[in-house]
């Protein structure tokens, strides 16, 4: 079965029920979803688009690229693309000309959909890349896409195609080089969605408060698939605003967010047990959740955040338990591997590490992507001979009574700092710094050092009203950790640089301080 067929199977018997309600008061029924996706799918198929065969023989259907702001219609475009048997490519609407030049050249979409205000410059880039069709889509249900679709029939029989057919391309963040397009199949998305629906206890009477962007796996695949494929209602916010979330929480049962969202909610006095009285689940992902935020949220609301672990190439692969009978939700851990997914930790030689030892995280299962678009060598080096995907993350699997089988992420392998021959894992140092009085959060990274190879550097954000000094922070760190782990320099910043999903961009910090110790990059 493909993703759209699974959606149709999840329609409630009464299609006049509301499926999506927006923060502006718009209501979309399940029948509206059926009709709108049919009309959009008919438009796409009327364009006589053609796919192509990749170098490895895989057929890539026509690609529809969406560079749009968040709207229900943008979600319907995604569903219609899958209904038409095509491939959906979501792109961050913040991307500008140079970035879009790369993505459109690499993915070679047949269709680009953009915000009306971006049409002039983006259509020029698109046509230079031989894109055949460029449509516009506004957040207020305007644009040429909907204008053209309005003339189409609202009846459409989805094509019959295999679950192994490609249906989406997700580009990785590309913090260490050019972004890679992960090729995902219907089977990848559907297996992951069904696992999460069962593991997190989704039911038709759930209401998901959706405040995430939809150009990312978290907001588009995890959040929307869980709700729609379980017949649940979406309460749709155009963007994340703490006050708007608090206003709508009483109408919801599930909320998914990134750590930055939770820290901003914690800054609101209105975040109380009473405000969360009807909630059954808060999920966090896309970046590590600070243990202090985990504890503060539980104390304020009576709810323990469920932290999970996933990536563009694999969907979700680990999750803390939902049901208390399955185990506790632990701070600083992403939980055990999801049912049907295998996760292991190996050393540099590829041999399995003993429980509790730090190593490289690898994953295998039906959720794992097919490969990287146009990068056969990168695809080959990312998998072992027995099909384990190398995530690039470093972590460990718990061995204690409380955390046995639970995965903890230490950091990215590329973030490992080797100073004077010793390995330093930034997450460990950050954990110690974050426990110091007055510290809100920190980021630890390495830069070239003429003597040690790399020097440990920290960027620290103070709590409101706190006065932090570099000397004091270094002195306190020396009392907690071995000297080779102590940052040689500490910078106190108003905030850490982050991407759209709240991940700290350490590459920007490294670039800014690359010449700090006067050594040349290796």
Task: Please provide the spans of the model-predicted regions.
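Conserved pre-ATP/AMP-binding loop-to-beta segment of ANL
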Residues: 15-16, 152-171, 177-178, 201-207
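Conserved AMP-binding/adenylate-forming
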Residues: 26, 41-95, 423
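Conserved AMP-binding A3 loop
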Residues: 27-31, 167-194
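Structural core segment of the AMP-binding/adenylate-forming
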Residues: 83-148, 464-466
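Conserved AMP-binding/adenylation subdomain of ANL enzymes
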Residues: 190-207, 215-254, 268-270
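Gly/Ser/Thr-rich phosphate-binding loop
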Residues: 252-257, 266-328, 342
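Conserved ATP/PPi-binding loop(s) of AMP-dependent carboxylate-activating enzymes
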Residues: 322, 336-340, 349-382, 422-424
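AMP-binding/adenylate-forming catalytic core of the ANL superfamily
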Residues: 365, 370-371, 381, 394-485, ...
């Amino acid at each position: 079965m493909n993703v759209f067929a699974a959606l149709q199977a999840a329609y409630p018997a009464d299609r006049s029920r509301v499926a999506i309600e927006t923060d502006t008061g718009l209501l979309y029924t399940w029948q509206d979803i059926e009709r709108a996706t049919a009309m959009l799918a008919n438009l796409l198929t009327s364009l006589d688009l053609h796919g192509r065969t990749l170098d490895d023989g895989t057929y890539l259907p026509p690609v529809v690229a969406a560079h749009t702001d968040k709207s229900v219609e943008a979600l319907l475009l995604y569903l219609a693309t899958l209904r038409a048997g095509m491939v959906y490519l979501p792109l961050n609407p913040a991307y500008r000309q140079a970035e879009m030049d790369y993505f459109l050249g690499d993915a070679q979409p047949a269709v680009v959909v953009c915000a009306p205000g971006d049409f002039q410059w983006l259509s020029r880039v698109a046509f230079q890349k031989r894109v055949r069709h460029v449509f516009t889509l506004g957040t207020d249900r305007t644009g040429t896409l909907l204008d053209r679709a309005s003339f189409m029939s609202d009846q459409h029989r989805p094509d019959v195609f295999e679950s192994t057919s490609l249906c989406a391309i997700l580009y990785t963040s590309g913090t260490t080089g050019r972004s890679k397009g992960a090729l995902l199949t219907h089977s990848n998305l559907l297996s992951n969605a069904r696992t999460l629906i069962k593991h997190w206890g989704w039911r038709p009477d759930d209401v998901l408060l959706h405040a995430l962007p939809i150009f990312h796996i978290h907001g588009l695949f995890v959040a929307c698939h869980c709700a729609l494929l379980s017949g649940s209602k979406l309460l749709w916010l155009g963007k994340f605003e703490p006050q708007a979330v608090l206003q709508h929480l009483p109408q919801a049962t599930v909320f998914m967010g990134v750590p930055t969202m939770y820290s901003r909610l914690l800054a609101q006095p209105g975040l109380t047990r009473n405000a969360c009285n009807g909630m059954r689940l808060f999920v966090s992902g896309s970046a590590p959740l600070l243990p202090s935020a985990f504890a503060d949220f539980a104390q304020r609301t009576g709810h323990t955040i469920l932290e999970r672990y996933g990536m563009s190439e694999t969907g979700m692969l680990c999750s803390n338990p939902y049901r208390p009978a399955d185990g506790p939700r632990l701070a600083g851990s992403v939980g055990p591997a999801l049912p049907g997914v295998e996760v292991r930790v190996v050393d540099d030689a590829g041999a399995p590490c003993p429980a509790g030892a730090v190593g490289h995280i690898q994953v295998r299962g039906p959720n794992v992507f097919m490969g990287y678009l146009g990068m056969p060598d990168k695809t080959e080096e990312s998998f072992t001979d027995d099909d384990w995907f190398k995530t690039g993350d470093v972590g460990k699997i718990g061995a204690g009574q409380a955390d046995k089988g639970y995965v903890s992420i230490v950091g990215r392998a590329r973030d490992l700092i080797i100073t004077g021959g010793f390995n330093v894992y930034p997450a460990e140092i950050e954990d110690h710094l974050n426990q110091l009085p007055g510290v809100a959060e920190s980021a630890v990274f390495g830069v070239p050092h003429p003597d040690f190879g790399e020097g440990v550097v920290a960027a620290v954000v103070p709590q409101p009203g706190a006065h932090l000094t570099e000397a004091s922070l270094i002195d306190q760190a020396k009392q907690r950790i071995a000297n080779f782990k102590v940052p040689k320099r500490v910078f106190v910043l108003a905030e850490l640089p982050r991407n759209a999903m709240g991940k700290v961009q350490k590459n920007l910090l490294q670039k800014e301080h690359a010449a700090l110790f006067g050594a040349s990059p290796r």
